[in-house]
C-alpha cells in the first residue's frame, strides 16, 4: 500500500506540475493561433455517448491495454467517475504497475461529460440519490440533485451492454468513485450491488440528505449477494472536520454491512495518513 501510495502521490505531483506548465504556456503564447504539439494519452479512445434514459451527453475515455490489438484475450474493466480529473492519473498509474507485473492489464473507462465546465451541476445531478434543495455546492446546483437512479440505469442498461458488445470485456468489473462519486457507489451497494463485483469507494459523502444512505443500509435485512463482491473503503485521517464526521460515517456503514448477513460480500477498510478530502483520491 505504501508503494502504491507513493506512486499515486508522484503521479498527482506530476499532474500539478503539468497543469502549471500548461497555464504558463498559455500565458506566453497568447498570440499563437494553435499548438502544434498537443499532449495525448497512448492507447486511449474517446467517444460521445448520448443516453436515451436520462438524456445526458457523456464523453467516454476508454483506455485499452497495450497488447489489446495483438491478441484475443478478454480483460477486466474499471469504471471511473469524475473522469475529467481521475482518468489520466488512474490510467498512467495502472500502466506503470501493469508493466511491472504488479496488477493485471485492464480496460479503463472514464465517464466524463460533454461540458466539463458544468462539473458541479453534472455530478450533483448524477451522483446524488435524492433531491435536496440546499447543501452540497449550494442551491444553484442542488436544484438538479437526485438523479442517481437514472444514472444507474444509464450505466446498467446502456453503457455496460455497449462496452461488452464493442470490446473484449470479461466479467471482472470494478467501480471507482470519490466523494459524491463514492456516495453513488454506496447507493449501488445498497440498491443495485449486482452491477459490479469490485468497488473502490473513496471518502463517500454519506452525510448527504441527513445520512439518507446510512439509514437505508440500516433498514436492509441483509447484504447477501449472488456473486462474490469485494469492497475497498478508503478515507483520509483528516476527514472528521466540524459537522462532517466522514471517517465516523464510513466506519458505521462498514459496521452495518458486517453486522448483517453478508454472503459473498467482503470489505477492506483503509485510513490513509496525512490525507484530507481533497488529497486522498490520488493515494487510493
Predicted regions and their residues:
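Sec-dependent N-terminal signal peptides
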Residues: 4-13
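A domain-start/cap signature at the N-terminus of enzymes
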Residues: 18-75
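Serine-hydrolase catalytic machinery in alpha/beta-hydrolase-like enzymes
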Residues: 73-154, 158, 162
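Active-site nucleophile loop of the alpha/beta-hydrolase fold
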Residues: 113, 200-208, 238
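Alpha/beta-hydrolase fold nucleophile elbow
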Residues: 167-178, 199
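Gly/Ala-rich beta-loop-alpha elbow adjacent to hydrolase catalytic centers
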Residues: 177-181, 185
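Conserved hydrolase catalytic core segment
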Residues: 187-197
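C-terminal catalytic histidine-bearing segment of alpha/beta-hydrolase fold enzymes
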Residues: 234, 242-284
Amino acid at each position: 500500500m505504501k508503494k502504491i501510495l507513493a506512486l499515486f502521490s508522484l503521479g498527482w505531483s506530476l499532474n500539478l506540475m503539468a497543469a502549471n506548465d500548461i497555464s504558463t504556456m498559455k500565458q506566453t503564447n497568447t498570440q499563437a493561433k494553435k499548438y502544434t504539439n498537443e499532449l495525448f494519452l497512448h492507447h486511449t479512445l474517446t467517444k460521445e455517448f448520448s443516453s436515451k434514459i436520462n438524456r445526458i451527453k457523456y464523453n467516454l475515455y476508454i483506455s485499452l491495454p497495450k497488447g489489446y490489438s495483438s491478441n484475443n484475450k478478454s480483460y477486466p474493466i474499471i469504471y471511473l467517475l469524475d473522469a475529467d480529473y481521475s482518468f489520466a492519473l488512474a490510467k498512467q498509474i495502472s500502466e506503470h504497475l501493469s508493466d511491472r507485473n504488479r496488477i493485471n492489464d485492464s480496460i479503463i473507462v472514464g465517464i466524463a461529460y460533454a461540458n466539463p465546465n458544468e462539473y458541479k451541476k453534472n455530478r450533483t445531478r448524477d451522483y446524488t440519490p435524492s433531491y435536496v434543495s440546499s447543501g452540497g455546492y449550494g442551491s444553484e446546483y442542488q436544484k438538479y440533485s437526485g438523479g442517481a437512479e437514472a444514472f444507474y440505469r444509464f450505466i446498467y442498461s446502456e453503457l455496460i451492454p455497449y462496452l461488452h458488445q464493442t470490446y473484449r470485456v470479461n466479467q471482472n468489473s470494478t467501480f471507482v468513485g470519490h466523494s459524491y462519486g463514492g456516495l453513488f457507489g454506496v447507493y449501488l451497494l445498497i440498491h443495485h450491488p449486482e452491477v459490479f463485483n469490485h468497488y473502490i469507494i473513496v471518502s463517500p459523502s454519506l452525510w448527504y440528505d441527513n445520512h439518507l444512505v446510512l439509514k437505508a443500509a440500516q433498514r436492509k435485512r441483509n447484504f447477501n449477494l449472488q456473486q462474490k463482491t469485494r469492497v475497498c473503503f478508503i478515507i483520509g485521517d483528516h476527514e472528521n472536520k466540524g459537522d462532517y464526521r466522514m471517517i465516523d460515517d464510513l466506519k458505521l456503514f462498514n459496521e452495518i454491512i458486517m453486522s448483517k448477513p453478508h454472503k459473498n460480500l467482503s470489505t477492506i477498510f483503509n485510513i490513509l495518513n496525512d490525507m484530507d478530502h481533497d488529497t486522498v483520491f490520488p493515494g487510493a
